[in-house]
From Swiss-Prot:
Signal peptide: none annotated. This is Exodeoxyribonuclease 7 large subunit. The gene is xseA. InterPro entries: Exonuc_VII_L, Exonuc_VII_lsu_C, OB-fold_nuc-bd_dom. One of its GO terms (molecular function) is nucleic acid binding. It comes from Clostridium botulinum (strain 657 / Type Ba4).
Length: 401
């Protein structure tokens, strides 16, 4: 039988291809304890998984490590999901981890989802039950560990935003045995303090076990039944607990919870100054507008006052009088001109003017002008009119030409 000789690279590649083709090794779920943990600056995580008899090298690349819900540590028991393959360059096989959970955490997640679904069906998460967060709280109740970073963050935020706000701190256990009971007692106690306006329920980040006190059913009902609004600031932004769904407002961190509960004094002062400025401008504009209206109405009233009406009528009468005089004068001038023209025309046609040339006029005794000799046949006497007088004559005879 002829045995084919392989190079090292060919052998490693053959083993890799064989492992990659195996269904079980491509979907491996391996339980063990973390050791030799190294988190590279690139974001990749290198470690080993071991049990009592063996160990295997593991790598978790950055894209998968980003989605981890906990920070891995040496000595931590975990279940790693991934595929087994060969690193050809070294000829070593290792587990390429795509997801990883803490051993025993699965039961907690199941319990969390079960309680979450139960309370959701009961309506504890409905927005209609959410109480309004007061804008200007004077006293803020805080339920948290007296020694934790959460309290320091809340105090720092409060000092920065508004030193006049009073914090009433109820020291509570935030993890471990009986921690839920102290949180419940804190809610009951602060609800009895009349001048507490709002309650912050807070703690810093941690694993699901460390935050488990905030997944307590009795605590959820206590938050729901609180007469005072409650803001939760539990863990980090990616951490969600049952009380976050029940509370009146969920903040991603304790600091963010304080930002919501404590109004910023400087911002408020600036808003008040802006309102004052806007009100002043509005009032000035209104006064200016009303003053213009007033002046307009004043002018209308003055224009329609009896005195002004009489004065205006006198002015109108004077204007009409002046106009009438102008028209009369114009009419008289026209008549004078017409009379002068007619006088000149009449003078030009005055028969007496003809008498000045030596001619005479003959009238009968009735002063009727006689222009034909036939009219003399019936007359005995006639009047002769000269340029400077008249004479009465008797007709002795009539001679025809």
């Amino acid at each position: 039988m002829h045995i084919k000789t392989l190079t090292v690279s060919q052998l490693n590649r053959y083993v890799k291809n064989t492992l990659d083709a195996d269904f079980i090794l491509n979907n491996a779920s391996v339980k063990g304890e973390i050791s030799n943990l190294k988190i590279h600056s690139s974001g990749h995580i290198y470690f080993s998984l071991k049990d009592g008899g063996s160990k295997i090298n593991c790598v978790m690349f950055k894209s998968y490590a980003y989605n981890l819900k906990f920070a891995p540590e040496n000595g931590m028991d975990v279940v790693a999901l991934g595929n087994v393959s060969v690193y050809e360059k070294e000829g070593s096989y290792q587990l390429y981890v795509k997801d990883m959970k803490r051993e025993g955490i699965g039961d907690l997640y199941v319990a969390f989802e079960k309680l979450k679904e139960k309370l959701k069906e009961e309506g504890l998460f409905d927005d209609v039950h959410k109480k309004e967060i007061p804008k200007f709280s004077k006293k803020v109740g805080v339920i948290t560990s007296p020694t934790g970073a959460a309290l320091k963050d809340i105090i720092n935020v409060t000092k920065r935003r508004n030193k006049g706000i009073e914090l009433l701190i109820y020291p509570a256990l935030v993890q471990g045995t009986d921690s839920s009971k102290t949180l419940i007692e804190g809610i009951k106690t602060l609800n009895k303090v009349e001048d507490v306006d709002i309650i912050i329920l807070a703690r810093g980040g941690g694993s699901i076990e460390e935050l488990w006190a905030f997944n307590n059913e009795e605590l959820a009902y206590s938050v729901y039944n609180s007469k005072k609004p409650i803001i939760t600031g539990v863990g980090h932004e990616t951490d969600f607990t049952i009380v976050d769904f029940v509370s009146d407002r969920r903040a991603p961190t304790p600091s963010a919870a304080a930002e919501i509960a404590v109004f910023d004094r400087e911002v408020l002062i600036n808003e008040i100054l802006n309102y004052k400025y806007n009100i002043k401008n509005s009032m000035e504009n209104i006064i200016k507008e009303k003053r213009n209206y007033l002046n307009l109405y004043k002018q209308k009233i003055e224009a329609n006052s009896p005195t002004n009406i009489i004065v205006n009528e006198y002015k109108n009468i004077d204007n009409l009088k002046e106009l009438l005089n102008m028209k009369i004068e114009g009419k008289l001038n026209k008549e004078k001109n017409d009379l002068s023209r007619l006088s000149s025309l009449l003078e030009a046609h005055n028969p007496l003017n003809v008498l000045k040339k030596g001619y005479t006029l003959i009238e009968d005794e009735g002063n009727n002008l006689i222009t034909e000799k036939e009219a003399l046949k019936e007359l005995n006497k006639i009047n002769i009119i000269f340029k400077d007088g008249r004479a009465k004559l008797s007709i002795e005879y009539i001679e025809e030409f």
